[in-house]
């Protein structure tokens, strides 16, 4: 693939060198050319910082670090849009949208950083900072029960399916005493979706992966998207009664 500067809804358009088809970066799909309608698989990815990744994966086998590309004139140590880590007057924090949009969705601040997720053909944009503040957020995408958990070691939001075993009601989770607990059994879970203590020890949840985007770009490309926070989030009142956990429906 390569980019020649063309944009659609303020999002990069890619060209594959084999057929010349045009691809949407945010959809991961060809929208024009011989491969029109062809999609790419999403691979697991976390947008984190090097210092966190280095610590978490230090002891892991088969970990590779990509080398900075050589040649050319691009400085890969400098972000041309400023720094998303430092509050101030830069592209990550101000209201500028440099290129035209077909629509601007007002449900979130345009520069809100979201994880855009598709589950069973339902789309949802998840506010990463909302998950960071709440620690644990139970929600639905269509009829699929999900939970977003803040992984403090990587400083990322991770999304899991709350259906642990077939035939049983989906679990509900809460943040209590600095730990992730399911409210039915009070078992303790980690941010990797694994139960590490209690009646459900050894159980695990399936993780879902999406794409990282600004809200304005995700919503412009996917106007039918739901949101977190929003109506899909399980209310806090439902988390106060363990015997009601299996009765919470979208």
Language-model region placement:
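Mid-to-C-terminal functional-domain signal that highlights helix-capping/loop sites
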Residues: 1-250
């Amino acid at each position: 693939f390569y980019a020649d500067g063309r944009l659609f809804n303020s999002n990069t358009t890619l060209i594959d060198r084999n057929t010349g088809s045009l691809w949407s970066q945010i959809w991961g799909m060809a929208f024009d050319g011989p491969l029109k309608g062809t999609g790419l698989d999403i691979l697991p990815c976390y947008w984190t910082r090097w210092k966190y990744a280095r610590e978490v994966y230090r002891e892991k086998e088969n970990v590779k670090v990509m080398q900075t590309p050589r040649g050319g004139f691009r400085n890969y140590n400098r972000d041309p849009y400023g720094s998303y880590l430092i509050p101030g007057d830069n592209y990550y924090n101000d209201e500028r949208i440099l290129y035209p949009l077909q629509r601007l969705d007002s449900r979130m601040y345009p520069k809100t950083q979201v994880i855009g997720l598709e589950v069973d053909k339902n789309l949802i944009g998840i506010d990463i900072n909302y998950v960071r503040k709440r620690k644990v957020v139970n929600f639905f995408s269509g009829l699929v029960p999900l939970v977003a958990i803040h992984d403090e070691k990587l400083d990322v939001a991770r999304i899991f399916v709350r259906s642990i075993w077939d035939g049983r009601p989906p679990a509900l989770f809460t943040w209590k005493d600095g730990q992730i607990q399911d409210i039915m059994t009070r078992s303790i879970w980690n941010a990797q979706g694994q139960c590490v203590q209690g009646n459900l020890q050894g159980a695990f949840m399936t993780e879902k992966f999406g794409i990282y985007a600004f809200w304005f770009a995700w919503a412009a490309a996917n106007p039918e998207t739901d949101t977190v926070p929003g109506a899909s989030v399980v209310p806090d009142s439902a988390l106060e009664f363990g015997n009601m956990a299996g009765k919470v429906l979208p």
